[in-house]
Design a protein with these regions (language model features):
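Hydrophobic alpha-helical segments of multi-pass membrane transport proteins
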Residues: 327-332, 353-367, 371, 390-424
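Select transmembrane alpha-helical segments in multipass membrane proteins
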Residues: 6-17, 42-45, 82-95, 141-146, ...
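Membrane-water interface regions at transmembrane-helix termini and the short interhelical loops
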Residues: 33-37, 63, 78-79, 85-94, ...
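Transmembrane helix-boundary motif of multi-pass solute transporters/channels
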Residues: 9-47, 240, 256-259, 263-266, ...
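Membrane-interface "cap" regions at the ends of multi-pass membrane proteins
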Residues: 1-28, 57-62, 66-78, 84-85, ...
């Protein structure tokens, strides 16, 4: 089947795919895990996994997309008709993620506007974030702004929308992160006890491997953290890379392009740690690190406030960079939904953008209301306390994505065979230097690791085998 939409070339694909991979998780989760898991030790483990596990999953999704020229919904059926159900499972992931990603994008938009109008100090006050997300109107307004931007890019299409904006946004994101990272290294602060901490010391905390108290169990936990971060970072097992792969022209060197995506994604994750860990260490010490929204919307505003006047500028630049990362990722999620719906309903991009936009709006409003009129709290199987947004995130990220990767590894590794993917990577005579490694990973390593990750991330492992 010939796709009517495509990227103009390798660079357009790499920037768009990197934009999808580089999301808020790179910026608010990677630095936290690095600080928690021994600094340089985590970095080393993560790098090894990128070169083995990461490239295997990324290569699989992109190659399936380009060879079948289909979106995820139909691509798996092309490999084997009995596996069509896997396409529907994959379609569920962006369907769920789209319900809440624009809500998070709205939070980022709110904070960016605060710093833009020099009101950033208010964000550093205790209780500000909770007060904002529980407000009945404000989160919906900022979500609408972010969702409108996302829908516009997708509406413009692959080459004139996603590729065009990625060519500007991704270099801009990289420059902003590099700028803040360099600034973080120059920081110095003396606390009330007279202790002075510097950005260079924070940098050493970041990159120096900490083997204190290292046991086999702790190393396995570090490896599992790195694996989960890598898995969620690369946008695999949600149909995005299959969809983007279907837009890649046949003359593009897939192996080279995938390597570039890996480098860009890993580089941004490293720079995010370099941007955040020294700054948080200088003003809050090692106890100031937190994960996710707590780091981004509570800890960092306190850091920016402690910087004084320059903190307002740095805060605006930081949330602009985070907004870029969120936008490119949300665009890829929405594009996957639109592309699949165009296949299902045989309608135009314009019509499906409108339909998916309405769906995203309605569900995002419900997610916003989950912090006020629809508020509830329950305990997930992995032990975490959850509201409505957390439930959607758990089902999509902790349950469906590892499960889909497990099934994909069985399909490719044992049903159609790794040679099916390798042939696509080498179709133009390009050398696939890691072909043997790919085969071993896809047949033996990925299925086992994904089963472990699935049981661990869902909390089902503790329920089945007992223990903590």
């Amino acid at each position: 089947m010939k796709k009517s939409s495509s990227f103009s070339g390798s660079l357009g694909f790499v920037l768009a795919a990197a934009g999808s991979a580089v999301g808020v998780g790179n910026i608010w989760r990677f630095p936290y895990l690095c600080a928690k898991d021994g600094g340089g030790l985590f970095l080393l483990v993560y790098l090894v996994l990128v070169l083995t596990f990461g490239f295997t999953l990324l290569t699989t999704d992109v190659a399936i997309g380009r060879r079948t020229k289909q979106n995820a919904l139909n691509a798996f059926a092309t490999l084997n008709k009995k596996w069509k159900f896997l396409g529907y499972l994959t379609f569920l992931v962006p369907t769920l993620i789209m319900t809440y990603y624009s809500v998070i994008g709205g939070w980022i938009t709110k904070y960016f506007t605060l710093y833009l109008v020099s009101s950033g100090d208010a964000a550093a006050q205790d209780g500000f974030f909770t007060s904002f997300i529980t407000s009945p109107v404000s989160p919906i307004v900022f979500m609408l702004i972010f969702l409108a931007l996302t829908a516009w890019v997708v509406y413009c299409g692959v080459e004139k929308g996603i590729e065009k904006y990625s060519r500007y946004i991704m270099p801009g994101l990289l420059l902003l992160i590099i700028g803040i990272a360099i600034f973080s290294l120059t920081l110095s602060y003396t606390d009330e006890s007279g202790m002075t901490r510097t950005g260079i010391e924070g940098f050493l905390v970041y990159i120096k491997p900490d083997f204190t108290g290292l046991t086999v169990q702790r190393f396995l936990n570090i490896a599992l953290d790195a694996m989960s971060q890598l898995f969620f970072s690369l946008s695999v097992s949600m149909g995005i890379m299959i969809t983007y792969g279907s837009y890649v022209k046949d003359d593009v060197d897939l192996n080279k392009a995938n390597n570039q995506i890996e480098i860009f994604d890993t580089g941004v994750a490293f720079l995010a740690g370099l941007m955040i860990i020294p700054a948080v260490y200088v003003f809050l010490g090692t106890d100031g690190m937190a994960s996710g929204p707590s780091l981004t919307f509570i800890s960092l505003p306190k850091v920016f406030a402690a910087m004084g006047g320059v903190g307002r500028v740095i805060g605006a630049v930081f949330f602009l960079a985070l907004g870029f990362a969120a936008l490119t990722s949300c665009v890829s999620v929405m594009e996957t939904l639109v592309a699949n719906c165009m296949e299902i309903f045989r309608k135009s991009r314009k019509e499906m953008c409108a339909a998916v936009g309405v769906y995203s709006l309605v569900t995002a409003v419900l997610i916003c209301m989950g912090y006020n009129v629809l508020y509830f709290e329950l305990t997930l199987p992995n032990g975490s306390a959850a509201q409505l947004l957390d439930v959607m995130d758990y089902i999509s990220n902790s349950f469906l994505m590892p499960f889909i990767s497990l099934l994909t590894s069985i399909l490719v590794g044992w049903v159609v065979g790794p040679k099916w993917i390798i042939a696509e990577v080498e179709k133009n005579g390009e050398h696939f230097g890691r072909a043997k490694l790919y085969s071993v990973m896809m047949k033996y390593v990925v299925p086992v690791v994904m089963l472990i990750l699935f049981l661990t991330s869902t909390g089902l492992g503790s329920l089945i085998f007992g223990g903590r």
